[in-house]
UniProtKB/Swiss-Prot annotation:
GO terms for biological process: aggregation involved in sorocarp development; defense response to bacterium; intracellular iron ion homeostasis; intracellular manganese ion homeostasis; iron ion export across plasma membrane; iron ion transmembrane transport; manganese ion transport; response to bacterium. The keyword Manganese applies. Divalent transition metal (iron and manganese) transporter. Residues 173-182, 246-253, 308-326, 398-421, 490-491, 549-565 are extracellular. This is Natural resistance-associated macrophage protein 2 homolog. Residues 1-151, 204-224, 275-286, 348-376, 443-468, 513-527, 587-629 are cytoplasmic. It comes from Dictyostelium discoideum.
């Protein structure tokens, strides 16, 4: 026990100098292994303000506190035993309850209207209970890697990988491959690495704070800023849904010959599909996603064998190079690969794996490790599909000097150029499956974003209907006015909009996970901060280049309408978005000042060490010289 504490009289004035005095003394008392009857001089601060110098056995209040602590420990042990009894195998860990049977709060959530159905996959009766042991076993060795535990964590990243191979990705990959060959493969690789870094930050934020990114934004920013962020993310989700509508319609056209406008109308019925699958448990939902993704992957494995790309040309595509003509397509690839709403969805689905409430460092580290493995496996699968699409376009279309401007045109060209209908049918089937799998995660992401930012909760089917309606209207107008070619242009624009919305998710994510006040000891290391800052600067720079190119193209267009829209709408909107992004950074200026001070302190410490070493060397040399003399 601390002697300084024992010699110090406590009173009301200096009580705050030593927080939780009795708790400190009890802890020391237990650490010394003293028996209950052993006398130990301590100071007890009574409720009346008197200080009593006595022993533990003479203090009824101390004995009462000790009994209460023992009772609490017994209750905790009973709860842990009960929790261990409830832990079952990974295939039986899911409480397969429907979405609408769940009614719990988001974050603090006491002020959220819980009437109506909600997609709250964090709730314990719709989650997976994962068994955990301490990072250090009794013999002091680290806990071993567990396949059974990994199986419990596999799944959340499947929802994220869906967004990395939706019809919007197909459009940008096909255009990139048919126009520039293998030249943009490095953009896909960099986008995948970038996505892995960002998704791991999302995992860390969710595990440490128990909040997804939208909930944390609501805590850190004002209501006005949150409303603007919500609107930007809603636009990104509608853009994603627009790609799903067009992709599904084209897939139906390829497989069954349905007119595009009829296919767009049919896509509105997928609300009924979501109403059906929302009654499933989360593991069955993950298995459905896995089945769809496996079928898409197999389609393109066969496509690659049929297209026979040249290996040397494939590897040359990983050398970074970019020109003014490919900037727009590269931006679309980045937006299609690293989708902003995925950063919000991932944090929420990660919380479906329930870990012990004590939030021990070892538990969080284990959960983080298994979630990262899940993410790496799922995103690399999505990366393979995207690379396969671009390689297919390069080896078939670019080699034949054909630029693809429509997805349906890609189907017809595959039939002609590859001497058979198998590749074309697989292409149409994969496109249809990609549209349907994206439908499932789109509604989940929209509900999470809406609840997280503005605490608004509506029924999932109503949310799905509104989002799909906002996507169907522009798709139908474009098909009627411009025909099939217009849908392809609309797909590219939707992916550019996704990329423009990405910084508004990435910047807060990096700031939050690098803050000690939010993350504690789990905050990002300096090297991770630098890497993610480079990623953010790359995204912002690419978006600025795209916006400038769009403004320049519209201003030099002969159409008066294009010039008016640019001056009245596009330029003010671009300025407003830049101002909002700056505000997200400036409002957290303490983070940047702390970061700079940390960098300078490290430099000063290194300089001081060098000075000390030089002085020591100089002193040593001086002594040696004197000795010689």
């Amino acid at each position: 026990m601390n002697n300084n504490n024992n010699n110090k009289k406590l009173n009301k004035e200096n009580l705050n100098e030593i927080e939780n005095w009795n708790e400190i003394e009890l802890t020391d008392y237990k650490k010394q292994g003293l028996d209950e009857g052993t006398s130990s001089n301590i100071y007890l601060f009574e409720s009346n303000g008197n200080v009593v110098n006595g022993s533990i056995e003479d203090s009824p209040k101390q004995q009462q506190q000790q009994q209460q602590q023992q009772q609490q420990q017994q209750q905790q042990q009973q709860q842990q035993q009960q929790q261990q009894q409830n832990i079952i195998s990974s295939d039986e860990e899911i409480e397969d309850k429907p979405f609408q049977d769940r009614d719990s709060n988001i974050g603090d959530g006491s002020d959220i209207d819980s009437s109506g159905d909600s997609i709250d996959i964090e709730n314990t009766d719709y989650s997976i209970l994962v068994p955990f042991e301490d990072e250090e076993n009794n013999n002091g060795s680290k806990s071993k890697f567990s396949i059974k535990k990994l199986k419990s964590f596999l799944g959340p990243a499947l929802f994220i990988s869906v967004g990395y191979m939706d019809p919007g990705n197909w459009a940008t990959d096909l255009e990139g491959g048919s126009r520039f060959g293998y030249q943009l493969m490095w953009v896909l690789l960099f986008s995948n690495i970038m996505a892995l870094f960002l998704q791991t930050l999302v995992i860390k934020l969710a595990l440490v704070t128990k909040n997804d990114l939208a909930q944390q934004c609501r805590k850190e920013y004002s209501k006005t800023v949150n409303i603007f962020l919500w609107l930007i993310l809603e636009l990104a989700i509608i853009s994603t849904d627009l790609a799903e509508v067009i992709g599904t319609a084209i897939g139906l056209n390829i497989l069954f010959g349905l007119p595009l406008i009829a296919g767009v109308a049919i896509t509105s019925l997928d609300t009924l599909l979501f109403l059906a699958i929302q009654r499933w448990g989360i593991r069955k939902l993950e298995l459905l996603i896995l089945l769809l993704l496996s079928m898409i992957t197999m389609c393109f494995v066969i496509e690659l064998f049929l297209s026979k790309p040249i290996a040397s040309e494939v590897f040359s595509g990983f050398v970074p190079r970019l020109n003014s003509d490919s900037v727009m397509v590269a931006t679309g690839i980045v937006g299609a690969t690293t989708m902003p709403h995925n950063l919000f969805l991932h944090g929420s689905v990660v919380k479906s794996r329930k870990i012990p409430n004590d939030r021990r460092k070892s538990v969080i580290k284990q959960a983080y490790r298994y979630n990262v493995i899940d993410t790496v496996l799922a995103l690399n699968c999505a990366f393979f599909v995207n690379i396969a699409i671009l390689m297919l376009a390069a080896s078939v279309f670019w080699k034949s000097n054909i630029q693809v401007t429509e997805l349906s045109e890609a189907y017809r060209l595959l039939t002609k150029l590859m001497d058979g209908k198998l590749a074309a049918v697989l292409f149409g089937l994969g496109l249809f499956l990609a549209g349907q799998s994206s439908t499932i995660t789109g509604t989940m992401a929209g509900q999470i974003v809406m609840e997280g930012f503005i605490k608004l909760r509506i029924k999932p089917w109503l949310r799905r209907f509104i989002t799909r309606l906002l996507a169907i209207i522009p798709a139908a107008i474009v098909i009627i006015v411009l025909g099939d070619k217009g849908t392809y242009t609309l797909l590219i624009i939707s992916q550019v909009l996704l990329s423009i919305g990405l910084p508004f998710a990435v910047v807060p994510l990096i700031i939050f996970t690098s803050s000690y006040e939010i993350m504690g000891e789990f905050k990002n290391r300096l090297s991770i901060i630098i890497i993610n800052s480079i990623i953010a600067l790359f995204i912002i720079g690419l978006n600025l280049a795209t916006i400038f190119q769009l403004i320049n193209d519209f201003l030099h267009n002969d159409s008066i309408i294009s010039k008016c829209l640019t001056i009245i709408f596009l330029i003010p909107l671009s300025i407003a978005l830049c101002c909002l992004l700056l505000w997200l950074i400036i409002s957290k200026i303490n983070f940047f000042t702390n970061l700079l001070s940390k960098i300078f302190n490290n430099n000063n410490n290194n300089n001081n060490k060098n000075i000390i070493n030089n002085n020591n060397n100089y002193s040593g040399n001086t002594i040696n010289n004197q000795t010689i003399q």
